[in-house]
């Protein structure tokens, strides 16, 4: 066997070290962002108002990273409101201090102050979102998170020609903080929004708009495009369509799916969906539409937000060249069921669906809204949100700090695992089941297998609820209409390739079962992502204990953690 000269061996070692450093740097980049929270005047629907923004943009800037990257975001508060930012769907493994919900994991960033969010993107790739997580500020303080695969790792589907971020939202002519504050004072529901938006604009068919207004997506015939679609609306489940074009779903909530074709998407607040669109139509402009889904007797904004898909070499700019789209009926439950039934995890060798097959902790949580007595309210009652008949009261000290430092009197660990009052949840149950108030949490040991059945209730009216769990992804193993039956319902569960996500819509008058593993120590918020329901108290939190190893332990709090 020939022996390499010393200089040749040193050269090879140096080359190997360089390649190793390149590989490590490719997977361990630190990305720096600065978010300045500032007021800006914005004109929509014939009127102008000041809104909170990040860096003066609405929606805010897109945060780009790759799987494995460390992300540093300095948030500077230049406005008169307290602010926090939540990185919706980012797992925050052991870094719960940076999760963002006010008074759950941190005190707000006060006017004139700043906070450096510091987290790593671990085992995730796809589309998520960031948004303010205090009061109703996320109405305008929100934006996209685009997590690209590691360098050299392809998508598990044909690579698109280009990608585009599509942020769906709502617009109020009034100040949104005034809207919810007045509603809370009176004890009633808030005013609905005045329009739906696509990338911040109601679109070319809205009040005071011209045919050229709104977001425009330019395409070339024969090319395939990936749309990263985010529902950043406060209170509405939304349908999304593109006139004359089929959509191929390839990912939801930053998890790859088995691809399937559809002409209509259903996206609840907080959810994301990536679709491929083939530009296979003739020259012209084609309408994109966003419209509400509500299959309960609840008032929602029925305005359709629009944008245009514009083919290259389209000569005419008049409305005559615009292909319109017909939104689904507002109560199109059959379209929603077909869409959600089509969602399955990819469950490939590279992207397995690690569904817990056994259950250590089983919870049945009823979710809904009810009424409590309120002598000062306009009707003598106050609308409240509940989980297991508990209306959550926000503390003045963050629960994570109280947990970490063993501060007494901030929360109690007696959140009920099953309903305290059992009744026909989706039938003719009690119409005035007074709730209990409390800052109650449910404690979980590290790495337990957890099943949560989310059961809608009809105390006022059955209604869908988009439930978001911080700190974890979960598998949606089952759903059904009516009341969950612990004896028969589990036989319908999908434990092979259920969809994995961080936000799930509990169907109107039905139930959804999710499973996850409590492998992330800290305090993790779970709440309805209809902001009005969260304001009313439809929320709770899990406290997850540390594991035995340092890698299973919550990191210490940062030195610049905001103080209350």
Curated annotation (Swiss-Prot):
Reported cofactor(s): Cu cation
Full protein name: Laccase-22
Organism superkingdom: Eukaryota
Free-text function comment from the UniProt entry: Lignin degradation and detoxification of lignin-derived products.
Gene source species: Oryza sativa subsp. japonica
Main localization of the protein described in the UniProt heading: secreted
Family membership: Belongs to the multicopper oxidase family.
Recorded catalytic activity of this chain's protein: 4 hydroquinone + O2 = 4 benzosemiquinone + 2 H2O
Keyword Oxidoreductase: yes
Residues annotated to bind Cu cation 4: 465, 528, 533
Cell location: Secreted, Extracellular space, Apoplast
Signal peptide positions (record): 1-25
Assigned keywords, A-Z: Apoplast, Copper, Glycoprotein, Lignin degradation, Metal-binding, Oxidoreductase, Repeat, Secreted, Signal
Positions bearing carbohydrate: 41, 82, 118, 191, 302, 331, 379, 389, 424, 437, 447
Cofactor: binding comment: Binds 4 Cu cations per monomer.
E.C. numbers: 1.10.3.2
């Amino acid at each position: 066997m020939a022996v390499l000269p010393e200089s040749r061996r040193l050269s090879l070692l140096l080359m190997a070290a360089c390649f190793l450093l390149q590989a490590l740097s490719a997977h361990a980049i630190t990305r720096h962002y600065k978010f300045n929270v500032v007021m800006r005047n914005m004109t929509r629907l014939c009127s102008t108002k000041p809104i909170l923004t990040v860096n003066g943009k609405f929606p805010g800037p897109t945060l780009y990273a790759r799987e494995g990257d460390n992300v540093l975001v300095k948030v500077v508060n230049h406005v008169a409101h307290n602010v926090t930012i939540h990185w919706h769907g980012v797992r925050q493994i052991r870094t719960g201090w940076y999760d963002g919900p006010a008074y759950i994991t941190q005190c707000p960033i006060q006017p004139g102050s700043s906070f450096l969010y510091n987290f790593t993107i671990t085992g995730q790739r796809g589309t998520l979102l960031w948004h303010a997580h205090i009061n109703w500020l996320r109405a305008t303080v929100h934006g996209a998170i685009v997590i690209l695969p590691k360098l050299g790792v392809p998508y598990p589907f044909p690579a698109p020609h280009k990608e585009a971020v599509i942020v769906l939202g709502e617009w109020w002519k009034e100040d949104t903080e005034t809207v919810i504050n007045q509603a809370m004072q009176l004890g009633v529901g808030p005013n609905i929004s005045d329009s739906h938006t696509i990338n911040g604009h109601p679109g070319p068919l809205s009040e005071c708009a011209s045919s050229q207004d709104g977001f425009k997506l330019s395409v070339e015939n024969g090319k395939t495009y990936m749309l990263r679609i985010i529902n950043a609306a406060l209170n509405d489940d939304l349908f999304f369509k593109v006139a004359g074009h089929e959509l191929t779903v390839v990912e939801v909530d930053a998890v790859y799916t088995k691809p399937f074709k559809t002409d209509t998407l259903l996206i609840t607040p907080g959810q994301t969906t990536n679709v491929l669109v083939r530009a296979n139509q003739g020259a012209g402009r084609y309408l994109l539409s966003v419209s509400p889904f509500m299959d309960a007797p609840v008032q929602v904004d029925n305005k359709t937000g629009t944008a245009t898909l514009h083919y290259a070499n389209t000569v005419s700019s008049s409305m005559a060249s615009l292909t319109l789209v017909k939104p689904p009926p507002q109560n199109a439950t059959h379209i929603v069921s077909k869409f959600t039934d089509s969602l399955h995890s990819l469950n490939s060798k590279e992207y397995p669906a690690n569904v817990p097959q056994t259950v250590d902790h089983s919870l049945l949580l009823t979710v809904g809204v009810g009424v409590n007595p309120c002598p000062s309210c306009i009707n003598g009652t106050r609308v409240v949100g509940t989980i297991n008949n508990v209306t959550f009261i926000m503390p003045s000290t963050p629960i994570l700090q109280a947990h970490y430092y063993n501060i007494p009197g901030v929360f109690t660990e007696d959140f009920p695992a099953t309903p305290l009052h059992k009744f026909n949840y989706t039938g003719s149950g009690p119409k005035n089941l007074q709730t209990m108030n409390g800052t109650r949490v449910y404690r979980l040991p590290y790495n337990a297998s957890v099943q949560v059945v989310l059961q809608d209730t009809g105390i006022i009216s059955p209604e869908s609820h988009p439930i978001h769990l911080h700190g974890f992804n979960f598998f949606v193993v089952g759903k059904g209409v009516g009341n969950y039956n612990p004896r028969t319902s589990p036989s319908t569960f999908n434990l092979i390739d259920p969809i994995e996500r961080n936000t799930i819509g509990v169907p109107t008058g039905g139930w959804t079962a999710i499973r996850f593993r409590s492998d992330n120590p800290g305090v993790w918020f779970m709440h309805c992502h209809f902001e009005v329901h969260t304001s009313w108290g439809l929320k709770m939190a899990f406290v997850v204990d540390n594991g035995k190893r340092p890698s299973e332990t919550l990191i210490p709090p940062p030195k610049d953690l905001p103080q209350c």
